[in-house]
């Protein structure tokens, strides 16, 4: 029997209704949630992502600012712009779309964002706080994955979770969130020997490698929850994940589709983080 689909679009719609209601309440009290999105260069995927983020803001009643710059923008100019946004009381979240042009140091830029406005959760202060379970903001993609597990009331405590991919953006924070929820966690990377040995042992399998269809059905435990974070464009123009959906869906108990799984949830959790930043600002 095919796996149950974990529909990120449907879950996002439900959560965004809640976000819009809370946004209306905080706005009525004089603090409209505000998100500034900065994109440097003309990466086509980045343009699509920022457009989706700005539209999502509008849909839930947020104030949004989209700042587009050419790839020639200097690092110091970008840092100066971030400093201005840090000081702007109408802006509660600042997001710099990655990747940045090679002459700009991403780490320097991300560290320049005030931690209380770092709604992506990438600032080292927020990453460190996540490690000890006191994070201001959870990184949006892992946060979205946890919400997906929550939506099916999956018993995470004592479950064996395997994460394929050890990035700072997905793999490492995902491990922290699952650990805090009581799972036994294994992180696999490009040096891992006998990857299938680990993936076949996973009750919860999270894949974030950027390699199309690298996890096939024979690498999945029967009945597992499979969360596919990858989004890859094939030569024929079609999108696919890092999991071979067509074989994995006959083995897994639950699986996220690509597109329409984790992607919409990432944007929804960005909205949630921005809302929470605004609610916090309204109390001060």
From Swiss-Prot:
SS bond partners: none
Stored Gene3D superfamilies: Leucine Dehydrogenase, chain A, domain 1 (3.40.50.10860), NAD(P)-binding Rossmann-like Domain (3.40.50.720)
GO cellular component assignments: cytosol
Annotated catalysed reactions: (6R)-5,10-methylene-5,6,7,8-tetrahydrofolate + NADP(+) = (6R)-5,10-methenyltetrahydrofolate + NADPH; (6R)-5,10-methenyltetrahydrofolate + H2O = (6R)-10-formyltetrahydrofolate + H(+)
Keyword match NADP: yes
One Pfam family from the record: THF_DHG_CYH_C
Example of a GO biological process term: L-histidine biosynthetic process
Key word Ligase present: no
Protein keywords: Amino-acid biosynthesis, Histidine biosynthesis, Hydrolase, Methionine biosynthesis, Multifunctional enzyme, NADP, One-carbon metabolism, Oxidoreductase, Purine biosynthesis
InterPro entries in the cross-refs: Aminoacid_DH-like_N_sf, NAD(P)-bd_dom_sf, THF_DH/CycHdrlase, THF_DH/CycHdrlase_cat_dom, THF_DH/CycHdrlase_CS, THF_DH/CycHdrlase_NAD-bd_dom
Domain of life assignment: Bacteria
Gene transcribed to yield this protein: folD
EC number: 1.5.1.5, 3.5.4.9
Protein's name according to its UniProt entry: Bifunctional protein FolD
One of the record's GO molecular function terms: methylenetetrahydrofolate dehydrogenase (NADP+) activity
Function of the protein: Catalyzes the oxidation of 5,10-methylenetetrahydrofolate to 5,10-methenyltetrahydrofolate and then the hydrolysis of 5,10-methenyltetrahydrofolate to 10-formyltetrahydrofolate.
């Amino acid at each position: 029997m095919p796996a149950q689909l974990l529909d990120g679009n449907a879950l996002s719609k439900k959560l965004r209704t809640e976000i819009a209601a809370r946004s209306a309440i905080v706005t009525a009290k004089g603090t409209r949630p505000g998100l500034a999105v900065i994109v440097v260069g003309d990466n086509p995927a980045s343009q699509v992502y920022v457009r989706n983020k700005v539209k999502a803001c509008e849909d839930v009643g947020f104030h949004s600012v989209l700042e587009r710059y050419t790839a020639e923008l200097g690092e110091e100019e970008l840092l100066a712009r971030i400093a201005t946004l840090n000081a702007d009381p109408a802006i509660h979240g600042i997001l710099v779309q990655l990747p940045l042009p090679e002459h700009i140091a991403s780490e320097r830029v991300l560290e320049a964002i005030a931690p209380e406005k770092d709604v992506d959760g990438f600032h080292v202060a927020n990453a460190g706080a996540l490690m000890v379970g006191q994070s201001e903001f959870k990184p949006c993609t892992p946060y979205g994955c946890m919400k997906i597990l929550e939506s099916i009331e999956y018993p995470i405590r004592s479950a064996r979770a395997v994460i394929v991919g050890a990035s700072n953006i997905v793999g490492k924070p995902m491990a922290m969130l699952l650990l805090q929820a009581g799972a036994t966690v294994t992180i696999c990377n490009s040096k891992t020997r006998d990857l299938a040995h680990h993936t076949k042992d996973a009750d919860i399998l999270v894949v974030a490698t950027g390699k199309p269809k690298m996890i096939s059905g024979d690498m999945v435990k029967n009945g597992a929850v499979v969360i596919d974070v990858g989004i890859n464009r094939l030569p024929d123009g079609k999108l696919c994940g890092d999991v071979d959906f067509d074989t994995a869906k006959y083995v897994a108990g639950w699986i996220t589709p690509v597109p329409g799984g984790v992607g919409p949830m990432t944007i929804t959790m960005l909205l949630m983080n921005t809302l929470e930043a605004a609610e916090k600002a309204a109390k001060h």
